[in-house]
Amino acid sequence: MPQDTEGFYSFVERYRTAMSGERTGDIVVDSFSELSARKSFRREWTDAFLKSMEMDITVSDYGTMKDLDEYLFGSSEVVGLFMARIMGLDEDSYPYARYLGRAMQYVNFIRDISEDLQLGRLYFPGRNLKDLTLKAWSTGR
């Protein structure tokens, strides 16, 4: 996923074009569109994913876990839902697929703390860190 604003919005346009049934020439976008149709992905899952990727451009930190919830749904929980659908799992598994996606995102947050701070991003909510008597990491601002 592109980190730059222009690249991201160009990607979103190609995605929308592909979802309207038109080929884009972008193998990733066209293949996802085909997979999405074949596995009946819910459009709101992909919309949530794209919203979270946009938040990587527009939001630099989250005050509380509640503030982070929308980002987590789109950045990770829907990935679990996509995987459950690809694997043909029953919808009863969907809550667990969401939890697994969220857990993996927490691992990513921990792994990428240094890089995210260099990019001016902080995913661990400051208010919740204070509740745990942990100091918030500085983003240099």
Task: Briefly describe each language-model feature range.
Residues M1-R141:
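Acidic catalytic motifs of isoprenoid enzymes
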